[in-house]
Curated annotation (Swiss-Prot):
It comes from Saguinus oedipus. This is Interleukin-3. Disulfide bonds join C34-C102. InterPro entries: 4_helix_cytokine-like_core (IPR009079), IL-3 (IPR002183). GO terms for cellular component: extracellular space. Coiled coil: none annotated.
Amino acid sequence: MSHLPILLLLLLVSPGLQAAPTQTTSLKATQVNCSNLREEIVTLLNQPPLPSSNFNNLNREDQRILMKPNLRRPNLEAFQKAVKSLQNATAIESSLKDLPLCLPMATNASMQHPIRIKDGDWNDFRMKLKFYLKTLEIKQPQ
């Protein structure tokens, strides 16, 4: 028997284990467990059919764009737009709608373009979204 459901339940009900709100996160973000949301999206991305999700296949320019703090929201908007062109992606689309609550408010508008995702290409979408989520995990305190 797996203890994962019990652990997840404890994380949801125990206030000491939840992240404290910071100045960079909205109050609504306290209602959304950002770490769990990222993990949920990654779990959905890992469902078959699985592409090779080797981040080394992601070119340096795409990595740079996905790592830029001032492009977090524009990149998320690009993923939200791209998910609409994918089949069987309703669950991911729903989770992406909650993700803006986990991002800091934009400080200044960027003149750079957000990430480009090939229309209808699951492999491209998965690889880039996984990398993007990983950068959020590293950059954002939880």
